[in-house]
Amino acid sequence: MTHIPCFAQIAAGDIAFVGFNADNPDQFTIITTNYLEDGTQIYFVDAGWSGSALYASEGGILWTVPTGGLPTNTMVTFTGGGAGGFTTFPTGTLEAGVSVSSGTVVASGIAASMALSTNGDQILAFTGSVASPTFIACVNFNGSWSWTGTNSAEQTLVPPGLTSGTDCVVLSDKDNGKIDCLLLPDPATVSDYNNASNWIFNDAT
């Protein structure tokens, strides 16, 4: 019998970021805070939100949830390849060696590179399309929510539909960070993952 996936509407807070590494190779980890149907597709980009659109000069990847779906509290790690990032400049093709611990990943179709900056950056997660995104999570490790139009590759405003401290988080300008599980309540909620007080950091590889 042919398996036909039934797609549930994914919502803000159904995943949360729990780690990032901007020192090569780039890496980030999410946790599912709700069941994800198999075949669900999520974009991850390092493009900031200007208030009206994604910054055009940054790239991304498109992740597909594996057959059988993913239960709540599943961690998924994405690791860059090639020069350390996820997609190449200027074509936006997938770097050789990019991997994901569960599911599959392809280039997003954005003709730009996705490579995390050690000067601060952000990762936005959304469904829909690049032109019309529905945001579900964001980690900003540039120290503040801001958009000046200069050095825009490393800036973002709070994406629409998200609330800082609830389903997205702003963190210190550090190369690497992760949730400290010892600081989390049991059970942890999505807002616990998006509480900057529950994160630890370093600037080493």
PLM ranges: what are they?
Residues 1-5:
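C-terminal segment of classical bacterial N-terminal signal peptides
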Residues 6-48, 112-119:
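A structural motif detector for short, solvent-exposed N-terminal "entry" segments of globular domains
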Residues 22-23, 32-38, 48-51, 81-85, ...:
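Acidic glycine-/aspartate-rich tracts in secreted/extracellular proteins
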Residues 27-31, 43-45, 75-79, 122-126, ...:
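Residues within well-ordered beta-strands of beta-sheet-rich folds
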Residues 41, 109-205:
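Conserved beta-structured recognition patch
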Residues 46-59:
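Short, basic/aromatic beta-hairpin or loop at an interaction surface
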Residues 60-88:
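Intrinsically disordered, low-complexity Pro/Gly/Ser/Thr-rich segments with frequent PxxP/GP/PP motifs
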Residues 84-94, 103, 109, 115-117:
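Acidic, serine/proline-rich low-complexity intrinsically disordered regions
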